[in-house]
Amino acid sequence: MSFSLRKLLVPILVLVLFLDLCVESGFSQSTPARDDHVHHHGGGCSHSHDHDHDHDHDHHVKKTTAKVEMKLPEELAEEEDMRLCGFGPCLHDHDHESSSTLTGFALWLNALGCSLLVSLASLICLVLLPIMFVQGKPSKWFVDSLALFGAGAMLGDAFLHQLPHAFGGGHSHSNDHHENHDHHDHSHSDSPSHSHSIQDLSVGLSVLAGIVVFLLVEKLVRYVEENSSGSNTWGHHHHHHHAGSKKLKDEGDHNNLDQQSSSDAIVNSSEKVSGGSTDKSLRKRKTSASDATDKSDSGTEITSDGKSDKPEQVETRSSSLVFGYLNLFSDGVHNFTDGMALGSAFLIYGSVGGWSRTMFLLAHELPQEIGDFGILVRSGFTVTKALFFNFLSALVALAGTALVLVWGNEPGQSSLIEGFTAGGFIYIAVAGVLAEMNNSGKSTLKNSACHLISLILGMSVALCISLIE
């Protein structure tokens, strides 16, 4: 009996050992297949691994083209962010020398030449001069429409172009990875924590700083005007008022004396004939002379030539000029950042990237410069001065381009500059142009419709440019 049991145990033990060996060999084959292959999550890597055990491994990652593409600085920043997150490109056989890079004198010539070309866009306003003038002076409705078009372009540029770039939300970053196996599915998703630091809020703070700085600049300019040229103007008018009044009063007294002496002579000579009527006419003459004297003393700002000058018009004119100067300042800062972007495009991607950036800036600046010109003329600048100062602020782009070329790359903090400029644009458009339009006389249905269409047209142009970009 024991011998028979022993005979049965031997095959059972052999079977168990065989199964154990099979199981171990199966794990030894499947484990290297899982551990030895490396997952390269790249910006354009799509690969599949076929093993003897039919283990298909497909990575669903967003594909990009394998060829070299000339990209703008914003796209470079996107690739740098992906590389820092561990999703760098898997193709290293790019021919970097094939891009038409520029060095030395050619780099400076192309970059500064394109920057000057963008600056010349401000002279597009010369085309508007034949349409703008009616009977030798600028048409009010056309100037108002240009100013509101500029305000709409400013608001659209601030909210649709500058702030998305400053906050880094202009491009979509996809960091979701999905892996499919035959026998199990698993997905990885990155969910960043909702915490804020000073660095995260720096762009928003720069926008608020731009609004506050432009408010302070406006207050400062108003204070200087009121205490320098304003006081001289008031003193000048006050002097003319008293001098003119004194002169008119002396002439009135002299005329009264002459009239009184002649009247006395008439009374003495013809006292018997018309005594009652003469007294009545004398009283009438004296009353009219005294009324003229009182009017000359209490009149409003009567000068030596008899014309009146209203101080309210002078105050309104100086108030509008302040926003004209603020517009020049903000436009200069904006053109400086455009020059920096143009210089970095030439420096990193050569002539192809630089010229593509130039074309975009031209499309971006043409409506902006037209609106700035309208705001300057609306603020009280003459047409010649508006053209000159607008072109002068456009030339600031050359300084931004030269700074990048000397520095060797973009010096950074461009997002803070973009935010600051956006804050200035918002302040000028809302507190300047729109507020002045609401306070400028009587509003009719026709004027309101024209103003609204001009404002929306400026915003629409900014939207189209942002979508094309």
Swiss-Prot record:
Give residue spans, biased composition: Polar residues.
Answer: 257-279
| Native source organism of the sequence | Arabidopsis thaliana
Q: Where is this region: Disordered?
A: 33-58, 170-197, 228-315
Supply the Pfam families for this chain.
Answer: Zip
User: Where in the cell?
Assistant: Membrane
Segments passing through the bilayer: 114-134, 141-161, 201-221, 387-407, 415-435, 448-468
Q: Name one GO cellular component term.
A: endoplasmic reticulum
Which residue windows does the record flag with biased composition (Basic residues)? 235-246
**Annotated family:** Belongs to the ZIP transporter (TC 2.A.5) family. KE4/Catsup subfamily.
Q: Recite the UniProt keywords alphabetically.
A: Membrane, Signal, Transmembrane, Transmembrane helix, Transport
| Gene giving rise to this polypeptide | IAR1
Q: What segments bear the compositional bias annotation Basic and acidic residues?
A: 47-58, 173-193, 247-256, 292-315
Query: What protein is this chain from?
Result: IAA-alanine resistance protein 1
- What is the top-level taxon of the source organism? Eukaryota
Which stretch is the leader sequence?
1-28
Q: What does this protein do?
A: May participate in auxin metabolism or response. Probable transporter.
Q: What InterPro entries does the database record attribute to this sequence?
A: ZIP (IPR003689)
How does it sit in the bilayer? Multi-pass membrane protein
Q: Name one GO molecular function term.
A: metal ion transmembrane transporter activity
